[in-house]
Amino acid sequence: MIDNRQLLLVEDDLYSAETLKFAMEAKGHKVAMATNGKDALTMVNGEQPQLIILDVMMPKMDGYHFCRLLKFDTRFKHIPIIIVSSKIQDADRELGLACGADEYIAKPYDLNMLTDTVEKYLHSTVEEVNSANI
């Protein structure tokens, strides 16, 4: 059974990143952080996280581009991606999902709802891997 609950948080706003990191660590998760998609891509190539929480508007590489790159790479397409963004129009949400995000949550978000969503995807990922190993 997988016990590695490593999350990658990709967020360029330090306050938002630290708040979310604290909440995820309180739930028992290890959290790695990147401030842009380019650095996040390097991190994913080094050690695959169980789940990615991703902002959209970031320097160097935006969240949509990062999401597309991961979901079209067979090594990483299984990693759940939850976009958390201040871009709240229906077209923004549709674009995020079309890029391969598993969820699109608008800011400001309810922290309990976000942590519940993270838990749902982590639980699903662990069950899929465990059933594949049987």
Question: What are the residue ranges of the model-derived segments?
Answer:
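Charged docking surfaces used in two-component/phosphorelay signaling
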Residues: E18-A26
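C-terminal output helix
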Residues: Y109-E119
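Receiver (REC) domain active-site loop signature in two-component systems and cognate sites
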Residues: M58
